Every structure is written in C-alpha cells, then in structure tokens.
Amino acid sequence: VSSLATVSVEEISNLVDTPKMFQFYYHKDKGLNNSILQRAKDANFDVMALTVDTITGGNRERDIRTGFTSPPKFTLSSMFSYVTKPKWAINYLTKGKFELPHLQDYVKEGTNTAISIGNYFSTMLDQDMNWKDAEKLCSDWGGHFALKGILSVEDAKRAVDIGCTGIVVSNHGGRQLDGARSPFDQLADIVEAVGDRVDVICEGGIQRGTHMLKALSLGAKACAGGRLYLYAL
C-alpha cells in the first residue's frame, strides 16, 4: 500500500488480516512523514518499505502524452472516453470522490489540485533524503524495514548496515529512468552478497508466472509488481 494510495491504511486494516507492507514516500513535510508512519503503525502494518528511486520525478513520456494527472482532469480526450465508455462515467458520478487519504490533510496537490505524478515527486518529495534519513526512519518504525529501489551490491550492503531486514530490487518498472539496469540482471549478485542476511524481493518486469519462477530460482524470496492483477496473476 502506497503513501499515494486512494484507500487509507485504516480501511485496509479493517478489511484484511493478511500481512501488509506500506510503501513510504519521503516528503519534504516532516509532519506528513510522521503522520504516515504513525498511521501505518496504528493500522498494524507488518513492513515499511522506503522508496529510494523516486526522490524526483522521471521523464514519464506516457504520462506526458496522455496528460495524466491526479486527480484526473477533464479534457476533450477524456470526455470522449467517458462518452464512449458510459460505465466509466457512471462509476465517476456514483462512486466516492477521488482522494489521497494519507496526504490530503497536508497537501492539496493530488487530491484537490491536479498534478502529474512526475511533478508531484519533483516538488513534494525530499530530494535531500540520505542514508541517515533512511536509518532514522528504520529506527522510528521499529519493525521489519526495507529499501525499495536497490540496484547495486554496494547499496544492498549499506541497506543491511542501517538495519534493513529486506530490500526490493527494483527499477520502478523502468518509468523513472529508461536507462536503469534491469532488476533481473542485478538479482543474482545482490542475493549472493546479502541474501543470507535479508529477504530479497524482485520487482519490475514481472508479467507472468514464469517470470516469478526465474526470479525465485535466482534467489529472490518473493516477487512484487504494481499491476499484477492486470496480467491475470
């Protein structure tokens, strides 16, 4: 569950009793960071994963082309889509108002003010976040803690040194930096270096069951993905 989720940690905690991991985005607003951390604690989330590969927005060409924002803006193109797909319009009018419940008490952008994801990352997240910040967040959380976005052996070893119990080998689906290395290409070396001390999760490019089998065979403890439900997994 992400800091930018459209459903709150409290609601999710009441709905399911399975293990839950929170994906933390480190904002400039330290009050917001503290609020999110405490809410995840109070909702009995099991793992905190600090995202370290998006402290600034990437050049998301698809979002630029489609004009995607949060919340969605009405444009000629989107209105045409609603006209040709009436179920979309019905859902928009009858379902709950779009909101980002973890953020809305602190920032208008994303809930009341439309903004692209790239611009949100570049203006709201803390570009000065460093290893000391990650270590403090790990200590403040006091439970299972992971860094999400690790792609090198050196960073994997440093993650272990600051107290991480897991790492997510990920390039954010290739959307942050199109020239970033593939998680699959880095996985074996990272597992060899730290796999006996922390859980290593592979994320990125997972679109079918055989991809999971390959990642597990390289030593990953698990696989993750943002759109697995779209691939009938």
Model-derived regions: residue spans:
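Extended hydrophobic/aromatic segments used for targeting, binding, or gating
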Residues: 1, 9-10, 160, 165-202
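Active-site entrance/lid segments in N-terminal catalytic domains of soluble metabolic enzymes
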Residues: 1-161, 173-176
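Catalytic cores of alpha/beta
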Residues: 34-37, 151-163, 190-202, 206-221
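Glycine-rich phosphate-binding active-site loops on the catalytic face of alpha/beta enzymes
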Residues: 52-58, 164-180, 212-233
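Alpha-helix boundary/interfacial micro-motifs
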Residues: 61, 68-70, 84, 159, ...
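Glycine-rich anion-binding loop/nest that anchors nucleotide
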Residues: 146-151, 168, 202, 224
